[in-house]
């Protein structure tokens, strides 16, 4: 049986490893897939109103392409968030450290060990980096996806049949952002 201090240290290590892993929490997954579904469904309006593709006749096509696009966009969110989180954490470290130190009262400051202060700073830094990386990842990928859909639909594929135009523009847009998200820089 492991000593009590050992299990506490193990849980702290697990929390730290969780902060730096590629695995998403259920909350992050729901946020990513919800946003990805919304942004993937937006082009349906474009094709329904501008390209005159009937909603009922094209419902199966819209559903399949929206689901495929949702998966690829959520994949891109996850990859971009992972790359950005470490960069944001490094840039925000000093500011977060000052903020946490300032928030601790003098009494708390004297009672707390240096290790505990460092743990609080690390936890806050990871929380800030996670939030900023998540919001920027969603913004960046949504913008890129919608711009590529519009450019592909109205300029590159404008002479194609609307059904082929839809399939190619949604596939190209979601595939491109998924591909670009796999880069490490």
UniProtKB/Swiss-Prot annotation:
Its main location: endoplasmic reticulum. InterPro entries: SSR3. The keyword Acetylation applies. One of its GO terms (biological process) is SRP-dependent cotranslational protein targeting to membrane. Residues 1-27, 77-135 are lumenal. The modification Phosphoserine is found at residues 7, 11, 105. Keywords: Acetylation, Endoplasmic reticulum, Membrane, Phosphoprotein, Transmembrane, Transmembrane helix. It is a multi-pass membrane protein. Residues 49-54, 158-163 are cytoplasmic. The modification N-acetylmethionine is found at residue 1. GO terms for cellular component: endoplasmic reticulum; endoplasmic reticulum membrane. The chain crosses the membrane at residues 28-48, 55-76, 136-157, 164-184. The keyword Transmembrane helix applies. Coiled coil: none annotated. It is found in: Endoplasmic reticulum membrane. Heterotetramer of TRAP-alpha, TRAP-beta, TRAP-delta and TRAP-gamma. Belongs to the TRAP-gamma family. TRAP proteins are part of a complex whose function is to bind calcium to the ER membrane and thereby regulate the retention of ER resident proteins. This is Translocon-associated protein subunit gamma. The lineage of its organism: Eukaryota, Metazoa, Chordata, Craniata, Vertebrata.
């Amino acid at each position: 049986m492991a000593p009590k201090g050992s299990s506490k240290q193990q849980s702290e290590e697990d929390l730290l490893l969780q902060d730096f892993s590629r695995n998403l929490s259920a909350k992050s997954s729901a946020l990513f897939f919800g946003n990805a579904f919304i942004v993937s469904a937006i082009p349906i309006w474009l094709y329904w109103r501008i390209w005159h593709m009937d909603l009922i006749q094209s419902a199966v096509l819209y559903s399949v392409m929206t689901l495929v696009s949702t998966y690829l966009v959520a994949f891109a969110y996850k990859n971009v968030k992972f790359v950005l989180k470490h960069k944001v954490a490094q840039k925000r470290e000093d500011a977060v450290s000052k903020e946490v130190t300032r928030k601790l009262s003098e009494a708390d400051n004297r009672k707390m060990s240096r290790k505990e202060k460092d743990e609080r700073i690390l936890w806050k830094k990871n929380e800030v980096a996670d939030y900023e990386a998540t919001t920027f990842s969603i913004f960046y990928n949504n913008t890129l996806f919608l711009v590529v859909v519009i450019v592909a639909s109205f300029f590159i594929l404008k002479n194609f049949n609307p059904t082929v135009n839809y399939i190619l523009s949604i596939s190209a847009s979601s595939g491109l952002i998924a591909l670009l998200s796999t880069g490490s820089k």
